[in-house]
Amino acid sequence: MVDPATGAHTTSTSQMATAAARQALERAGVQADEIDLIVLSTASPDYLLPVAATYVQQQLGLEDCAVIEVRAGCVGAVQAHDIARRLLADGTYTTALVIGAEAVSPLLAPVFLGRDPERVRMRDRLTVYTFGDGAALVLRAGEEGSAHGRPRPVFATRSLGGARKPGMLIVGGGTDAPLAEQQRRPRLMDIRLDIPGTAQFGPRVFVEGIHDLLTRSRLALADLDACVLPEGNAEYFASEYAAAGLSPADQATLSKTIVENLTDVGATGSAAVPLALDAGWREGRIRPGDTVLLLAIEASRYLYAGLTLTWDAPFPGH
């Protein structure tokens, strides 16, 4: 995390993830040594190797723990959630931290630090003003589903952008070119957004995801108590629902259930869904027994990942 005023690098992805983990453990009254699985999603790890999840393990003081890292943006936290859910359900592990964490500011700092804001290109301003750093997680324990008389969770994920250029491309640090060649580029790291493409195609990805999850889970929109979709009420997004195939009646039903906090935290990649979920829970919009849909849309290759579940965490402080 980079301080936008001073340019000082203050916090890494794993440090943010660990801070969120400690907060969750304290809320739940769980000791760190009870954790036997960490599943972390990020597109901005501390290093290529070791994976950031192992640094969370280290910072929590866990000598021995299973770790899995999902390399993804917005969809990663939902994918990580399903991985952990399955491993807990079959008894492989007992208690898991499912983390989404993203530190985007170190990638964006060269765009604006020490520069006159008026001389920053408009497309770069959109990137700087849109993204944020963050980390959030779900602490999961035990088996769920039919053993408790509830519907089993349903998961689905797809990439709809196999024949399209990426809606988001983060360049640098990969193997597309030798490092010496990468260092000759104007920026070692760069985020490139296809703003028109994402505005036009993004809502279609969302609508496809909604229909897919409802079909697989045999639920109707009216059955959902909450739809955690970080960008669901964004004007540029919601204005395209009709063109993407969502009826006005379904739009009205959906808008009453959407839980998001984009205007509060910005676009936070892997952290977006768990941050919105946490906000909805703390605000009382998500209550024990609610049927919840977690749905993430990622512009990189126009992916979605969704998971239906029954929320059973008590209100904060209870």
Where are these regions (language model features)?
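Conserved active-site "lid/cap" helical segment
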Residues: 1-36, 173-223, 236, 240, ...
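Condensing-enzyme catalytic core mediating Claisen C-C bond formation in acyl metabolism
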Residues: 1-11, 122-200, 297, 308-318
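Claisen-condensing/thiolase-fold acyl-transfer catalytic domains that form or cleave C-C bonds
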Residues: 14, 18-21, 44-45, 63, ...
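Short coil/turn connectors at secondary-structure junctions
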Residues: 32-36, 62-66, 90-96, 125-126, ...
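Glycine/charged-rich beta-loop-alpha catalytic/anionic-binding loops adjacent to active sites
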Residues: 34-39, 58-71, 116-123, 252-261
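Active-site-adjacent elements of ketosynthase-type condensing enzymes
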Residues: 47-54, 103-120, 158-178, 234-242, ...
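Short beta-strand segments
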Residues: 71, 96-102, 140, 294-297
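Flexible, glycine-rich active-site loops centered on histidine and acidic residues
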Residues: 89-131
